[in-house]
């Protein structure tokens, strides 16, 4: 199949199945993989409190929810500007751009899930938000925020 025919076929097959594409993003160590495991109801994504980052490239997880809605969640590489070094940081940005571009070929991005650590909004947090929401998705995709690490916080509810 030629490239454009294959892309058209993939676009139609994904959209006919009513699949929603969701990108989960945030800094390194905020718990993106734990959110995936919570949604799955079991451990499907590697997590670690010892390693700087478990996710080295965007990983896809497919879920079918009651009612038949299919969701593909892409767990992205965590960004940590000061600690990553310039080359790994730029590589992560290139990978994020490639992910968004490839999803636009098959129906687009339906939702951004921004994972943040409770009580910790840093410059990197703000820049990560700007990169995904404003730059890569043109402020044109619905966004929801997931706040993690609230176990020790008082009066959060």
Where are the regions that the model predicts?
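Short, low-complexity cationic-aromatic patches
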Residues: 13, 19, 23, 29-30, ...
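AAA+ P-loop NTPase catalytic core and its hallmark functional loops
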Residues: 78-84
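Switch I (effector-binding) loop of TRAFAC-class P-loop GTPase G-domains
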Residues: 40-72, 95-98
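GTPase G-domain guanine-specificity segment
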Residues: 150-157
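Short, flexible boundary segments at extreme N-termini or domain junctions of P-loop NTPases and their
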Residues: 1-27, 97
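Short, structured motif recognition centered on aromatic/hydrophobic residues
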Residues: 22-26, 58, 73, 111-117, ...
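Glycine-rich phosphate-binding P-loop
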Residues: 20-48
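Inter-motif core of Ras-like GTPase G domains
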Residues: 84-120, 130-144
């Amino acid at each position: 199949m030629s490239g454009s025919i294959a892309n058209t076929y993939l676009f139609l097959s994904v959209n006919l199945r009513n699949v929603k594409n969701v990108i989960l993003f945030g800094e390194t160590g905020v718990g993106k993989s734990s959110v995936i495991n919570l949604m799955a109801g079991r451990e499907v994504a590697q997590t670690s409190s010892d390693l700087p980052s478990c996710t080295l490239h965007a990983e896809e997880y497919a879920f079918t929810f009651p009612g038949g809605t299919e969701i593909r969640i892409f767990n992205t590489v965590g960004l940590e500007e000061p600690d990553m070094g310039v080359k790994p940081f730029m590589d992560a940005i290139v990978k994020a751009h490639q992910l968004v571009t490839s999803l636009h070929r098959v129906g687009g991005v339906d939702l951004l899930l921004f994972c943040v650590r409770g009580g910790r909004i840093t410059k990197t947090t703000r820049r990560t938000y700007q990169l995904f929401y404003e730059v890569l998705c043109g402020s044109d995709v619905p966004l929801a925020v997931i706040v993690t690490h609230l176990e020790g916080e008082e009066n959060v509810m």
